[in-house]
């Protein structure tokens, strides 16, 4: 017997019993995004490798260790996208969407990183991303944060997440701070964990992200980035906080919050939870005013975020909402009545748009068909046999809760089904 082929480690199938929850989440998110006037954009999952080297940064863990990169038959280096922002910027610049105009965009789809698979962290994972372009003030920063807060309410997660904020200033601010931080950390080098010691020379701000207890203790005495911000960056951050205060959005200023992507500046934020263990960040974003120019376009202010769908699913499953069954009505034919039963099913799909009508196929006894009707999750079963056909009626049988089966005229079936489903 041939060896079975299975999915790649860290790249998971989403099975039929799971897709209902995914569709519910996607519909909720889509409705909120539409209410803010955001438009969907769809980008390819494969891009030129240079796109991510130039945007994310060549000395980041993502580019050095985690990207799925390969050469195609022409010898071009291509990469499965590890995140969506760079692709969105590339698409907007390529198609002239940023020329003298603002944009509010969103996208959803799979991303790829070669990481150690664990709960909430996979090699193929899915994100919903939001990107805005052409707006400089703290008002658009506040809008994208308000949008995420509304998403949590729509998903029933508002009590499970906390907002953390920081400002990274501009590149000159970060350079001054970097020098001060390096001097401090070198004086405490032996107290740092191994990963932080490696990061110190190449990407010292990433040390602020360390989860190591000893390193966290060292960082308590480290210089604060807030003391190195220019006046404009300070005013921007204060303006954002004032807008969030006025909107009733609670937040915590986290001086150690940095992002793992080199293009961020000024505002950065994360929504975190303590319900997922080590994978506590469910949404992260910030401002990246230099990225469009970095990728060959004109200077363009921008701010956005991405949220991990798998992590949201894990959160939602802890208090799983009552989702409707994938099938509302299960239709069964008993005897030589398949053609009229199929016609009845088509009639119901016309009469009850939005309802799922499933016709039993494959024949079988009454008992076996009823078992399959029950397993389908349908609320109502419809039975048509030769006697029903001759009498012009259909048997309507409730499959969930209370209620007696009844026979109704074929022309009244849609109304009868509706009454059982309400």
From Swiss-Prot:
Q: Name one GO molecular function term.
A: ATP binding
**Top EC group:** ligase
EC number, as in UniProt: 6.1.1.21
Q: Its domain of life?
A: Bacteria
Where it mainly occurs, coarsely classed, is cytoplasm
Entry's InterPro entries?
A: aa-tRNA-synth_II, aa-tRNA-synth_II/BPL/LPL, Anticodon-bd, Anticodon-bd_dom_sf, His-tRNA-ligase, HisRS-like_core, HisRS/HisZ, HisRS_anticodon
Identify the Pfam families for this entry. HGTP_anticodon, tRNA-synt_His
Q: Which UniProt keywords apply?
A: Aminoacyl-tRNA synthetase, ATP-binding, Cytoplasm, Ligase, Nucleotide-binding, Protein biosynthesis
Alphabetical GO biological process terms? histidyl-tRNA aminoacylation
A GO cellular component term found in this entry reads: cytoplasm
**Subunit comment:** Homodimer.
UniProt lists the family membership as follows:
Belongs to the class-II aminoacyl-tRNA synthetase family.
Designated name of the protein: Histidine--tRNA ligase
Species for this entry? Alcanivorax borkumensis (strain ATCC 700651 / DSM 11573 / NCIMB 13689 / SK2)
Q: Which gene encodes it?
A: hisS
């Amino acid at each position: 017997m041939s060896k079975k082929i299975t999915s790649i480690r860290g790249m998971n199938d989403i099975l039929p019993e799971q897709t209902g929850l995914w569709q519910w989440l996607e519909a909720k998110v889509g409705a909120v995004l539409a209410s803010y006037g955001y438009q969907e954009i769809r980008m390819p999952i494969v891009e030129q490798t240079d796109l991510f080297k130039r945007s994310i940064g060549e000395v980041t863990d993502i580019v050095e260790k985690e990207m799925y990169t390969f050469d195609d038959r022409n010898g071009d280096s291509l990469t499965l996208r590890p995140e969506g922002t760079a692709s969105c910027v590339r698409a907007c610049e390529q198609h002239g969407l940023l020329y003298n105009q603002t944009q509010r965009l969103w996208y959803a789809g799979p991303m790829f990183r070669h990481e150690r698979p664990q709960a909430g962290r996979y090699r193929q994972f899915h994100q919903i991303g939001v990107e805005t372009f052409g707006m400089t003030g703290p008002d658009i920063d506040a809008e994208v944060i308000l949008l995420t807060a509304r998403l949590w309410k729509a998903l029933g997660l508002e009590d499970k997440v906390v907002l953390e904020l920081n400002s990274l200033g501009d590149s000159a601010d970060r350079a001054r701070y970097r020098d001060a931080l390096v001097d401090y950390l070198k004086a405490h080098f032996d107290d740092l964990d191994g990963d932080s010691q490696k990061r110190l020379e190449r990407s010292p701000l990433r040390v602020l992200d360390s989860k190591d207890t000893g390193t966290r203790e060292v960082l308590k005495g480290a210089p604060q980035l807030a003391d190195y911000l220019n006046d404009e960056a300070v005013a921007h951050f204060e303006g954002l906080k004032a807008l969030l205060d006025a909107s009733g959005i609670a937040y915590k200023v986290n001086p150690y919050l940095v992002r793992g992507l080199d293009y961020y500046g000024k505002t950065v934020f994360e929504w975190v939870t303590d319900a997922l263990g080590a994978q506590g960040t469910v949404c992260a974003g910030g401002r990246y005013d230099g990225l469009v120019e970095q990728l060959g376009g004109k200077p363009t202010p921008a701010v956005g975020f991405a949220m991990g769908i798998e992590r949201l699913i894990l959160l939602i499953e802890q208090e799983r909402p009552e989702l409707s069954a994938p099938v509302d009505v299960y239709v069964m034919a008993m005897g030589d009545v398949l053609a009229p039963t199929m016609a009845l099913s088509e009639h119901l799909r016309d009469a009850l748009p939005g309802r799922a009508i499933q016709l039993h196929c494959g024949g079988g006894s009454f008992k076996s068909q009823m078992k399959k009707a029950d397993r389908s999750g349908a609320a109502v079963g419809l039975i048509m046999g030769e006697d029903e056909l001759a009498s012009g009626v259909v048997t309507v049988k409730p499959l969930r809760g209370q209620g007696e089966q009844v026979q109704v005229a074929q022309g009244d079936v849609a109304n009868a089904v509706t009454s059982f489903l309400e």
